[in-house]
Every structure is written in C-alpha cells, then in structure tokens.
Amino acid sequence: MTETSIAAQGTVAAIGERDEFSALLQKEFKPRSDHARSEVEKAVRTLAEEALRSASVVSGEAVKTIQSIIAEIDRTLSEQINHILHHEAFQTLEGSWRGLHHLVNNTETDEMLKIRVMNISKKELGKTLKRFKGTAWDQSPVFKKLYEEEFGQLGGQPYGCLVGDYHFDHSPPDVEMLGQIAQVAAASHSPFIAGVSPTTLQMDSWQELSNPRDLTKIFQTPEYASWRSLRESEDSRYIGLAMPRFLSRLPYGAKTNPVEAFDFEEEVEGADHRNYVWSNSAYAMATNINRSFKEYGWVSRIRGIESGGAVEGLPVHSFPTDDGGVDMKCPTEIAISDRREAELAKCGFMPLIHKKNTDFAAFIGAQSLQKPTEYEDPDATANANLAARLPYLFATCRFAHYLKCIVRDKVGSFKERAEMERWLGDWILQYVDGDPANSSETTKAQKPLAAAEVVVEEVEGNPGYYTSKFFLRPHYQLEGLTVSLRLVSKLPSGKGA
C-alpha cells in the first residue's frame, strides 16, 4: 500500500471520527437554530484540528474533552488579561473611572446639585496655566470656564467645589500649578480638592507612612522652600489634598468578583498592593461634600465619624497569610494612627482613616493646604485657624456666591446706605441659629452661623457705591479633647456641700 493511500485512509478516518463526534455534540447540546448548529460544527472542527495537531485521542465523553480544552483557553486568557489589568497605565485609567463612578453612584443629583466632568489631564492643565502666568492669569481658558462663564455672568451657576483626579507633590512644576489653581479657585470661591503623592514625604508608597518619626521635620529642608511658601499664601486655603487612595474594587475571581465570560482568577498578592486598583480619595471627600449639600443645603458636615465624614461600603478583600491565617487588605492602603493623623492634618493634608476590621473609613479632619498664620493677637490667630478649615470655608464661599447674585439684581434700584445695610442684615439672619447652645446638630447644619453682622459704608466721591463687610461666626466643630483622669476621695462639686 502506498503512502498516498495510507494518508488518504487516515484523512477519511479523521473525517469519519469528526462526523461521529459532531453528531454526539449535536445530541449533547441540542442546538435549536442554524446559528447555534453552525457554532457547534465550528467548535468540532477546532477540536478535531487541535486533537490531530497534538496527536492525542479525543475522549468518548465530549463534555469532559471540551471542558479540558476550555480550561486551557481560560488559563491562557487569564495570563494575558492579568498582564493588561496590572499595567500601570491601565490601572490608573481604571482607578479614575471607578473613582468617578463612586462619586456619581453615591450622589443624589437634581436641579440644585449637578456634576460636570471636564476631560483634561494634569499635563494639559499645567501647560494651559503656564501660558498665562503672572498678570495674565485671568485670561486663561481655565479662569474663563470656571469664573466668567458661571460666577461672573448673569444667570450663571457658580461651581461649589472643584475636584481634580490628580496627585501633587513638592516638585517645582506641581507647586507652581497648585498656586495657579488656587488663584482661580479663590476668584471663583470654589475650593479645589485633589490627591497628594507619597513622594511629597520622600516615600515610594503610603505603606511607608509609619516609618518617619516626625513628619514636620521633612518639610524644613531647603528643597521644600517653595512648598512652604505656597502653604503660607492666602489663596492656598482653597486647596484640599486628600490621601491615601481607597480600594476601587475587589480582585476578580470565583469567590470574590466572578467573571461570567470565562473562568478568570486575578493574580494578587495580599501583602503587595501594586496589583490592586486604587482611586483618588478626593472622590471620597467629594461624595461627602455632595451628601452634606443634599441633606442640609450647606457643606458643613463633611468630617468626623458621626458628622458626615464617613466613607462606607469599601471593598474588603481577605487573603491567606504565610503563617496559615487569614488577613484583610486595608482598603485605604495603610492604617493611620490618631497621632499620625494629627501630624498629617498639621502638614496640610486630609487623611482618610480606616476603621480596623471593617469596610468603614472616615475623614476625621478637613484641613486645607494653608498653614494658618500665628499673630500676637489670639483672636486674629483663631480667625486664621478657622479660615484654613474647609467646612467653614465652604459656608463662606456659598455666601459669596449668593451675595454677588442678589446684589447684582439690586443694581439700579433706589437704596440708601442704612436701607441696604438693613436689607442685607435681614437676609443673612435667615442662616443664623437663634439658640446655638441648645439647638440640634441638624439645625446647626441647616443654619451654619452662630452669629453674623453686616456693615455697609459709602464710597466717598462715588455716589451710589458702597462697600460692605460681613462678619460671620460659624458653629465651632470639635477638634480635640484633652482628658485628665484623677482618683479622688470626694468629687469637687461636693466639697462645698
């Protein structure tokens, strides 16, 4: 028998086996349409080619044979998808979208609360602002977009808060950009919230945060001169830098985050956070800001565990440890102690603190980047401290938005100085709590002022022009409490009895 005839017989045998196998699959899967029948036949051809290529014998159990091949395909796909998901550029992109999703999904938008998204990278923003340095800063497209088109225009809707999905450090380009952003934010009375990079503290990641003994000493070196100057500027109170990042999603896997398309297990090492997806914590702070505005009409309750600073429902991933136990991945990159949180706030940051063994975190403080100026007068120092905290600044900004709009509407009407002062005084008193010592937390959130006073003065030589000064005293929020415990034989209140 010739080789040609043997090969022909082998081909006929292969075709015969494939037809039998095809019939077996048709019986097993019972396709109900021509398309389904075509897909089964296509799978049979692929399976036959694979079997002949590897010189293996196809099992008589069609389902098991297919499952083994599918498992190999899943393994190959998983390896490729892992490479894609864990690429730094893809992780950054996914973290940004999931952070925005967190903000939108946890915000009740309506005609009074809107979210607008501007697609501009940090590099593009820096280049745009750099072209309009110095006295030309108010000619930049950014200024015109944020100020002139809304706050500076009749019928405009001023932005209450700006959120940048960026991470800044103490490098000269970043410091310069933050200063320019602060100018625009101050002019439009819209605080800017963004993230801070661990390189600001000479770290590769936030997992090194517990290493330094004293964080404040880091900022005393010469390379932080421009950073210190930025913090001492007036406009820096409009900048809020949140840290660290929060976990965006659970790793993909059958037991954590199943994928329907194929059997995919994402490769993550629990102790190493580089393969996880993290989002900018500025989104978490923005969510609290929106929630406070929705519930109370004011951005006053955005910090504290029980007063609006909570970030709930964070993804929780547990993993086996080397010693045979089970540990939980911190959803905020690193657990921050109370002492370190106070240090970070003093440095001008807003740390997100994770509650141990829970899916709960919170912003304890809401300190702006500004370093409050210390004066000889204690009252002046207290005023500077208040102005550097975001809950008080947000209230002041909202009053600024309203005042410009309502005063603009009054231009051209007949108003004397006393009449204007009385009218403005009556308006501001709507937001003053009449009994701050006994009112509830809800009342204080809805009426953010404990006291207010308005002074209107005429501009000499320019009839019809007035200058006004608003003195606003907000409700003070608890910043800390020093506790002293003493063992005594008799209480002090009972000594005089």
Predicted feature locations:
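A glycine- and small-residue-enriched flexible loop/hinge signal that marks low-structured segments
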Residues: 2-58, 108, 120, 146-402
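Extended assembly-interface regions of large multimeric machines
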Residues: 48-132
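Structured, hydrophobic secondary-structure cores that serve as assembly/anchoring elements
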Residues: 69-89, 107, 291-307, 311-497
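Amphipathic alpha-helical scaffolding segments
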Residues: 98-101, 179-187, 422-426, 487-490
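A short acidic, often aromatic-flanked loop/helix-cap motif at beta-alpha or helix-coil junctions
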Residues: 122-126, 201, 462
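Eukaryote-specific, cytoplasm-facing alpha-helical/coiled-coil scaffolding segments in long proteins
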Residues: 123-128, 189-191, 429-431, 494-497
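Short, surface-exposed amphipathic charged segments that create phosphate/polyanion-binding patches used
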Residues: 130-135, 207-212, 470-471
